[in-house]
Amino acid sequence: MSEEQQYQGDRWTSQSQNILKNLGWNQNGDSNFDIPCTNKSAHRTGESSVRKNPHGIDLLFSYFDPFLSKDISIIVESKHRKWAGISKSTVQEFLDQVLMTIECASSNPELKMLGCENIRTGLLMIWCNEPEKFDNEKFKEYVKELDIKTRRNPITIFVASNNEILKWCSIIEKVKELKPTLADFKFFYPSDFFSNGLSTANRKDHLTLIQMFSPYVFAKSKKIIRLNRETQTTQDINHIFFFAKPTIDELNFMFSCTKKFQFEDADKLIIHFYGQQTHLRVHIEEFIRRKNEKYEKDGSHLTIEIDYLNILSDVPENYSKGRS
């Protein structure tokens, strides 16, 4: 590996680190460290003595999962490649690398000392450093064709490309914009009907992987409105970060989901659409008008407003310089 490749790789690891920190994740230990392989025959790591510790960990993070009601640890592998260097075989190679690392990490005593036990989750962040050439449909084909062997103790790997990573950056930038004008902004986790009461409604400062890959991300906040020197009132504002195609059918489906956890119980609901959605403005405006007319007719004080997330072409430069 050339010095330039090493520099760009380290820079992307730093950017990945800051993206996840800005999403509220907690880092464990250092970046770019090795752990021993405990399954050398299966992982074929004993064939060369060039590297004593064959499994490298770019980043190790953890967060509390409201749906599972427990802390989980995630091994993050960050890859930085030109588009020509991203193929079905390279993505398969990256995936296998993460799987083998997790198999050995789950029983590693040093990681247990960091509070990371029974690690069974990974995040593979593959960034194409030629964003103008990146083909998301082709990348999705590569992911669909991955060969994943059945394991007695399952491992879950989330694979993110430019498409997902830039969406996360858009959320981060919008939340930074919102927080100075709002109080108590937190991401919202509805109760999970399928968990037999294990999961109750929750509000957290962080996003979990399930939400990060979801077409809808929910949040709640308050706005303090000062009426005069001595009097103020509080306005409840709910948020939906909307990444699906905003047709009337999709919007109606999304709202049918929110009814189950009373997300319309607020003074204002802001839907943050991803991009300007010019070609679907008719659908959006029609849906919002119908909803607001119904709320007014029913005597509800809720109003729906529209906002738009910027679609970024690259990861913001300041993400490579420490937490932004």
Model-derived features: where do they sit?
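Intrinsically disordered, low-complexity Ser/Thr/Pro/Gly-rich regulatory segments
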Residues: 1-56, 61-324
